[in-house]
UniProtKB/Swiss-Prot annotation:
Organism: Mycobacterium genavense
Name of the featured protein: Chaperonin GroEL
Reactions accelerated catalytically: ATP + H2O + a folded polypeptide = ADP + phosphate + an unfolded polypeptide
PANTHER family according to UniProt: 60 KDA HEAT SHOCK PROTEIN, MITOCHONDRIAL
Location in the cell: Cytoplasm
Molecular function in Gene Ontology: ATP binding; ATP-dependent protein folding chaperone; isomerase activity
Enzyme class, UniProt record, top EC level: isomerase
């Protein structure tokens, strides 16, 4: 029963990460799996589950605060291209994304679809 709860939790973490950030699902899944595994181990060893939950929540608050302090806005076309190129693993795709974002603006929507047409 606990394994099923843990699997559902990890699945939900991956879905929320994808919905909010669109990236980072692997990292979020690995972190969630480690938290579930170590949490169950600690509870089995006698730790208070509510105390454990409160500790995790405090850690999440502190980590979020630290990340937000070090975050940098991505504003210029060049910054967008560099960031997109890292995510895509390809500079030419990063440039295409930056160009598309330049055309639609900050509130615009870009839809990417796989083509079944060879060479287009």
């Amino acid at each position: 029963p606990y394994e099923k709860i843990g699997a559902e939790l990890v699945k939900e973490v991956a879905k929320k990460t994808d919905d909010v950030a669109g990236d980072g699902t692997t990292t979020a899944t690995v972190l969630a799996q480690a938290l579930v595994k170590e949490g169950l181990r600690n509870v089995a060893a006698g730790a208070n589950p509510l105390g454990l939950k409160r500790g995790i929540e405090k850690a999440v608050e502190k980590i979020t605060e630290t990340l937000l302090k070090s975050a940098k806005d991505v504003e210029t076309k060049e910054q967008i291209a560099a960031t997109a190129a890292i995510s895509a693993g390809d500079q030419s795709i990063g440039d295409l994304i930056a160009e598309a974002m330049d055309k639609v603006g900050n509130e615009g929507v870009i839809t990417v679809e796989e083509s079944n047409t060879f060479g287009l």
